[in-house]
């Protein structure tokens, strides 16, 4: 009988956005498949991989600190992810890092791991990786990455320089992955990319194949196909192209969740032009009105930037007026901060930090009031809730209007006889500006 040798252990740190999380999951899946053991602590690991974020300066700092901690605690560190595209910046602070790769360099990361910590003799009967792969999210929801890169050149963003132009994954491959996830117990799929609504543009929406059937490579066709899986499908990072109108009827028909994450960034035409973003606010308001007429249950999430270079009080007031009229359900707001390599750094009339802070506070105060009013309208109604956590006090879940991590929650006090992934009908009894409380029907 051959002696079972201990599995080499890899520590893993994943920073940044959901798109980075998908990259991490893909690397983890490969490592586990090859027989490596993924461990939660540095001191047990033969090596540590840090998947970094480099989108804004605070994320760069967090990534550099995580690399430093891994070096201090372990000593053997491979760096990958967005900040990896700036190797010199990392080497300047942490010259002892073993290897550095850029984003979505899965094969390179694995090659480096093999070099420093050779592959074990793997017995698939002893260490079975779940078919859907190793997920860093709870088992009942998963992110589905449909493309990489972006064709836009927004002046505040450096994603294209890090991740390149849009490259859509083959639709058959995407749908096969979705099917594997559902077969493994996933109840909710979150569709992500740098620009979800541009899916297929780079391949001229060519026809692919899934289960022998022709399927067009487009966001609408993808949604149609995902709707056949009988799960919650949630769309994120949807750039406001005209064809976004085509997915609203699918939401009204219950085929995908009535939820749209559509980053608008500002409402002043002048600032939008400086950002190189679409600039017709009146048209956007008209579309929102039309979407809600077609799908009254629609939840709209967006993100905005205050304090962008050149933003005047008049520009900011346009943004507040837009919020009052659009009455969006979920809103995130960022104070503009310069990002190394972004075109916006060269713009004149940078806004003082204290003005950014003051505008951010006014923005959030207004939006909290709007969000509270929107949620108050749900009191007394029945909604569907997917359970995320259960403890001795009760259950915490999310409605169709709530994406994990970034939106609110639904609290079911005393509801302990459920498990994560269960979908319940709940009567809403109370609301604040972010969350709901209710009881199972």
UniProtKB/Swiss-Prot annotation:
Residues 376-441 form the TRAM domain. It comes from the Bacteria. One of its GO terms (cellular component) is cytosol. It is found in: Cytoplasm. Its EC number is 2.8.4.4. It is an enzyme of class 2 (transferase). Keywords: 4Fe-4S, Cytoplasm, Iron, Iron-sulfur, Metal-binding, S-adenosyl-L-methionine, Transferase. Its main location: cytoplasm. Residues 136-373 form the Radical SAM core domain. [4Fe-4S] cluster 1 binds at residues 17, 53, 82. GO terms for molecular function: 4 iron, 4 sulfur cluster binding; aspartic acid methylthiotransferase activity; metal ion binding; protein methylthiotransferase activity. InterPro entries: Elp3/MiaA/NifB-like_rSAM, Methylthiotransferase, Methylthiotransferase_CS, Methylthiotransferase_N, Methylthiotransferase_N_sf, NA-bd_OB-fold, Ribosomal_uS12_MeSTrfase_RimO, rSAM. Residues 8-118 form the MTTase N-terminal domain. [4Fe-4S] cluster 2 binds at residues 150, 154, 157. Binds 2 [4Fe-4S] clusters. One cluster is coordinated with 3 cysteines and an exchangeable S-adenosyl-L-methionine. Its cofactor is [4Fe-4S] cluster. Belongs to the methylthiotransferase family. RimO subfamily. Catalyzes the methylthiolation of an aspartic acid residue of ribosomal protein uS12. HAMAP family: MTTase_RimO. NCBIfam families: 30S ribosomal protein S12 methylthiotransferase RimO (TIGR01125), MiaB/RimO family radical SAM methylthiotransferase (TIGR00089). This is Ribosomal protein uS12 methylthiotransferase RimO.
